[in-house]
Amino acid sequence: MLRKKHFSWMLVILILIAVLSFIKLPYYITKPGEATELASLIKVEGGYPEKGSLSLMTVKVGPANPFTYVWAKMHPYYEIVPDESIKEEGESDKEYMKRQLQMMKSSQENAVIAAYQKAGKKVSYSFNGIYASSVVENMPAKGKIEVGDKIISADGKNYQSAEKLIDYISSKKAGDKVTLKIEREEKEKRVTLTLKQFPDEPDRAGIGVSLYTDRNVKVEPDIDFEIENIGGPSAGLMMSLEIYNQLTKPDETKGYDIAGTGTIDVDGKVGPIGGIDQKVVAADKAGKDIFFAPNQNGASNSDYKNAVKTAKDIDSNMKIVPVDTMQDAIDYLNKLKAKST
C-alpha cells in the first residue's frame, strides 16, 4: 500500500511538471552557453594552422515556464528577463532568429574587413545602407522607427557604418536631440528624437534602436564561414582574431586556449555586449586560459570589470584581459611566451 501511494505521488508530480512546462510565462531565461572554437567554422584559403584555439562564447536563451522560472531563481548566473527585452512586440520566433542572424552576418563582414586590413591583405566593400533591426520598448525610437527602416543620415550627416552612426548618437547625453532622415517603403521622412537613459544602463543614453550595415565585401584570399544558428554581433572580436591568425604568421595563440567577446567595427574597435558574466562562467567551464573582455575605455561598469568580478566570484584561473581594439588583443598575444606543454 505504501509503495502504491509513493508511486501515485510520483505520478502526480511528473504530470504537474509536464503541465507546467507548457505554460508560457512573459519571460525568457538566459544562462551560460558554450565556448565554440572558430578554426573549424572559419576557413581562409591557404590559411595557417594554430596550436591553441580561439573561441566565441554563447548565451543560451529560452522561453520561461513555471518550472524553468523556479529553477532559474535557484541557480546563479541564470537570468530572468522580460519578453520585451529579447523580442519586439509581435515578433515571432522566426523573425527574432532572422534578426539575430542578420546581426551575425554584419558582424562577420566587420570582422573580415578589420582582419584583412590589419593583415595587409586585399579587401574591398561597397556600402548599401544602414538598417534598423530592432526597436526597444519604452525608448524614444519606439513608434517612430520601424524594423527595416533605412537610416540615411543623422543631423544632416551621412555615415558608412552602423557603428559610426551609433558612436555619434552615443556621444550625446540624455535630453539631447537627434534628427534622423529615414527611408520606409521608398518614401523618405525625418524624425526628431530626444535621447533617454537606458533603464538597465543609467550611464548610457540613446534612442533605443539596433542597427546593422548592409554591404558587399570582396577579399583575397577567399574566406568561408560555416557558422549556423548562432546570432547576434558579440562574436565580432573573436572572429576577427581567428581570421587574422589564419592570414598571418606566427601563430598568435602560442598554444593557449583563448576565449572572449565583444563587437567589432571595420576599424577594429571593440564594443560592449550582453551576458558577460554568463560568458565568463561558460569559458571557465570549458577550461579556457585567457578571456578578452570589452574595456569600454575604462568605464566604471565595463564588461571587463564585470568579467573580473565574475571570474573572482567563481574562483577562476582564467586571465581576464581588457581590450578596446583588436590591436589591444594582438599586442597582448604578441607579448605572451609559448604555452608550456
UniProtKB/Swiss-Prot annotation:
Membrane-related topology note: Single-pass membrane protein
Which parts of the sequence belong to the Lon proteolytic domain?
Answer: 187-336
Span-the-membrane segments of this chain are 9-29
Q: Name one GO biological process term.
A: protein catabolic process
- GO CC annotation terms, alphabetical: plasma membrane
Q: Name one Pfam family in it.
A: PDZ_2
**Where is it chiefly localized?**
membrane
Q: Which UniProt keywords apply?
A: Cell membrane, Hydrolase, Membrane, Protease, Serine protease, Transmembrane, Transmembrane helix
Provide the GO MF annotations for this entry: ATP binding; ATP-dependent peptidase activity; serine-type endopeptidase activity
**SUPFAM superfamilies tied to this protein:** PDZ domain-like, Ribosomal protein S5 domain 2-like
Family recorded in the similarity comment: Belongs to the peptidase S16 family.
Protein's UniProt name? Uncharacterized protein YlbL
State the gene name recorded for this protein: ylbL
